[in-house]
Amino acid sequence: MDIISIVLLVLLVVLVVAFIFYAQNIKKNKQDAESLFNEAENKANEVMANAKREAESLKMEAEAFKKEARYTLREEEQKQRREIEDEFKQERQELKETEKRLKQREEILDRKDDTLTKKEENLDSKEENLVRKTDTLSKREEQLAHIEEKKRLELERISNLSTDDAREIILSETRDGLTKEMAQIIRQSEEKAQVEADKRAKNIISLAIQRVSSDSVAEQTVSVVNLPDDGMKGRIIGREGRNIRTFEALTGIDVIIDDTPEAVVLSGFDPIRREIARMTLEQLVQDGRIHPARIEELVEKNRKALDHKMREYGEQAAFEVGAHNLHPDLMKIMGRLHFRTSYGQNVLDHSVEVAHIAGNLAGEMGENVALAKRAGFLHDIGKALDHEVEGSHVEIGTELARKYKENPIVINTIASHHGDTEPLSNIAVLVAAADALSAARPGARRESIENYIKRLKDLEAISTSFEGVETAFALQAGREIRVMVKPEKLTDDQIVILARDVKNRIEDEMDYPGNIKITVIRETRAIDYAK
């Protein structure tokens, strides 16, 4: 709808409104009608003017929109044209590249085709050669089969053996060889397992020992009693020696009175009787009344006092290792071990040490620690009575454990710790190991210097008795022997055999505690001088 139509429509509406108004108010005066008509005409003119202005504005906007639309369409057209041209150029470039790749591939295929053609020719040539060689091999196989048959017949004739007999001999030799190989493999596996077991055992033992700290004082077979003056020696001897005879008869201990100033020596191998004698003599010296009746009185008194002291020693040791609910009599018997020695080592201290080591070993092995300590504590209880009751200390200790209803594992441990019976539990084995460790610890026990020196000399003598040995040195208190050999006489393989021969001689000819390490050293030196 254009502007003119709108204007005409507005005029028509105004005329209709005026006519209606005029018709309704026809009776009004003409002046009012004219006024209204003029007013309507003015409004119509105003509307017409506004309509014209709006029409002009719309026309201008339409023209501007038209121009803008044309410009936009032109730009869009140019943009699309450029995009189409770019796409066309890109496609043309891709086509060129594709054409180039196809050309290159075609060249490669041509080269491969030439190569395949050459290979086919080579294969054909090789196939012909193979056919010729196959024919030749077939002929040679026939010849070899004929020759083998002749050789087989000739061998059967010479050896008087059939093919089956020869096969059986070969199989037998093969079986023997395989058996040797299997034995070697088994031996190597056993050696490897032994090395691993030794390594693990050393680790466990080192862990167990490093957690045990105990004092060890070498026990003596004599006791020394100090005197206030040398005049006391005559009073101890008494008139015609009656005091000293009574003293020695009641205590069983030798009283040695010599030129040592202000001292008397009590000598005896029973530590209990020696302790009673020491206590009695000290009290006699302190009291000053020395006569047979007084000696007898004090000996009996000190014997009872020592019984009480031994029970205290046993209770203290049992408490230290955690051996609870131990029978009172067993505690007293264990206390007697405080006055017993084995190779100079206090047996009660040794029992406590064995209990601690066995407990540590049991802890590392996952065994019952308390039971291991109890078994280790009681393992040498028989030594408290072995000089009073017939039988070995193992037998006496086993009977005591049975009498006081100890655990069967403890009984078996006591019975087997020296190998007299078979150990029936891991704890028995651990206690035996702990016993050996405590006894073999450097400084724990002593032996005579003569035996020690003799053992070292015997070790060196056995080692140097073999041909090719230059010298030998016994080290670590006889626990290791190092053998130096002459390199021009023995090879590296021969020194392995020498080490084994030395080991066998030592095992056959010597008695020794623990193990002895044999190290054979072969040293070759090449010396020259730069001038």
From Swiss-Prot:
Residues 221-281 form the KH domain. Keywords: Cell membrane, Endonuclease, Hydrolase, Membrane, Nuclease, RNA-binding, Transmembrane, Transmembrane helix. Residues 347-440 form the HD domain. GO terms for biological process: mRNA catabolic process. It is found in: Cell membrane. GO terms for cellular component: plasma membrane. InterPro entries: HD/PDEase_dom, HD_domain, HDIG_dom, KH_dom, KH_dom_type_1, KH_dom_type_1_sf, Ribonuclease_Y, RNase_Y_N. Its EC number is 3.1.-.-. It is a single-pass membrane protein. Pfam families: HD (PF01966), KH_1 (PF00013), RNase_Y_N (PF12072). It comes from the Bacteria. It is an enzyme of class 3 (hydrolase). The chain crosses the membrane at residues 3-23. One of its GO terms (molecular function) is RNA binding. The keyword Membrane applies. PANTHER family: RIBONUCLEASE Y. Endoribonuclease that initiates mRNA decay. Belongs to the RNase Y family. This is Ribonuclease Y. It comes from Lactococcus lactis subsp. lactis (strain IL1403) (Streptococcus lactis). The lineage of its organism: Bacteria, Bacillati, Bacillota, Bacilli, Lactobacillales. The gene is rny.
